[in-house]
């Protein structure tokens, strides 16, 4: 989840208060399993219900390949264990033990609550900042990038991803899209190291076709839309596997689902 308001909320830590002046933030504990079953009664496994839930939730229509995951992993592993690495808008994702997860909504892996517009760190503090699927959800992405640049050390690296042809998806709002070159322009305060396709064109096709047919047959009825989306999703999701091959070809940037950008702050 990411910040959807230009207002700058005061940041606060989740869990024990961190040592003043230190950059470590104590990791919050995940909710115990019993908290999801407040009655305390044993749950009965219903095979038909499990099958229905499975059919109601097809695999996602997009493919994030190991090549994409390896880019982020290599950036993290290139730094020492005491480097300050921030994953802003992390949601529940854990990239590595030495990465601090920031978000405006707490999860079991959130280290601190903070807005992307007001990171709780001084100038030139971070060695690496990661934003995955965040910039499209904020009302002022240029302001967000400016805050990232403020917190980066000279010579430090910024990694981000942003959609181009992904269908609308709220988290909690969905604001903007960028071409490969538009994303580079957004990050112009930095010097580009590398950029390219993050999620390929086959995922674009699978996702757009799912949304099109679900919207077409639903007539605007939300329940019919959800069921149609699930049914069509099961039929179309295999298309995404073509991206293992297609994302290697740069000319597919014209119809890519999303792009990544890696930039360095000038010394």
Task: Locate each region found by the language model.
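Short, positively charged low-complexity motifs
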Residues: 3-5, 13-17, 22
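N-terminal cationic leader/targeting segments used for protein routing and processing
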Residues: 13, 28-30, 266
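N-terminal capping/interface segment
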Residues: 58-75, 133, 238, 251-252, ...
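S-adenosyl-L-methionine-dependent methyltransferase catalytic module, highlighting the catalytic core
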Residues: 142-143, 147, 153, 157-266
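Conserved SAM-binding loop
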Residues: 70-169, 179-181, 263
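Class I SAM-dependent methyltransferase Rossmann-like catalytic core
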Residues: 25-76
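Short gly/ser/thr-rich secondary-structure transition/capping motifs
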Residues: 66-70, 110-111, 242-245
């Amino acid at each position: 989840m990411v910040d959807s308001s230009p207002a700058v909320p005061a940041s606060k830590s989740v869990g024990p208060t961190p040592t003043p002046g230190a950059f470590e933030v104590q990791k919050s504990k995940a909710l115990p399993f019993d908290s999801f079953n407040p009655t305390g009664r044993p749950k009965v496994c219903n095979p038909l219900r499990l099958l229905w839930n499975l059919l109601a939730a097809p695999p996602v229509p997009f493919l994030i390949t190991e090549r994409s995951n390896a880019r982020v992993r290599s950036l993290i592993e290139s730094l020492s264990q005491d480097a300050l690495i921030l994953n802003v808008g992390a949601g529940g994702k854990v990239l590595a033990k030495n990465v601090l997860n920031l978000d405006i909504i707490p999860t079991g892996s959130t280290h601190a609550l903070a807005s992307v517009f007001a990171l709780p760190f001084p100038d030139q503090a971070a060695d690496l900042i990661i934003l995955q699927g965040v910039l499209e959800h904020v009302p002022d992405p240029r302001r967000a990038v400016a805050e990232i640049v403020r917190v980066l050390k000279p010579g430090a690296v910024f990694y981000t991803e942003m959609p181009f042809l992904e269908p609308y998806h709220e988290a909690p709002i969905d604001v903007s899209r960028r071409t490969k070159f538009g994303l580079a322009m957004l990050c112009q305060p930095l010097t580009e190291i590398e950029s390219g396709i993050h999620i390929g064109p086959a995922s674009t096709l699978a996702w757009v076709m799912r949304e099109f047919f679900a919207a077409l047959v639903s007539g605007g009825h939300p329940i019919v839309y959800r069921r149609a989306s699930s049914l069509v999703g099961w039929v179309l999701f295999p298309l995404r596997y073509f991206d293992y091959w297609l994302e290697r070809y740069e000319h597919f940037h014209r119809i890519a689902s999303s792009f990544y950008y890696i930039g360095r702050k000038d010394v």
